[in-house]
Amino acid sequence: GEAFTAVTEHFAQFVRPSTSIAGIEARGFIFASALANRMKTGFVPIRKAGKLPHAVFSQNYGLEYGTDILEIHVDAIPFAGEVLLIDDVLATGGTLDAAIKLVNRAGGSVYQIVALLEIQALEGRARLAAKYPQIPVHSLVVS
């Protein structure tokens, strides 16, 4: 609907030419795939362990209640490719940190993080800024 279109158009301002757009499972896929289609560029899925069909890089990350694993195809990103990383929620920053590491291992570099919602009290933005000061973070809604 109109809200989805407005979000996608807002996120489009962060896309550079020849950029790949990576989305983190599952709701990050919704915005990242739509934006990649709109901008006529590649979509890179970053998924939970065991869901991608061939050779992958894996990365453990912490959750409030334990740990999990994200994966990316080893050939998902053109060599030295720039990546716009999209997720639905920025909370502690753990998932996005793991995704950045995966993009780096796949030969790319994240130049921007975009989230639909940021939960400010969980300080994910501060953690990411301390670890990756060169990567700006944009959140559409901050609560």
Language-model segments: residues:
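PRPP-associated nucleotide enzymes
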Residues: 1-86, 90-143
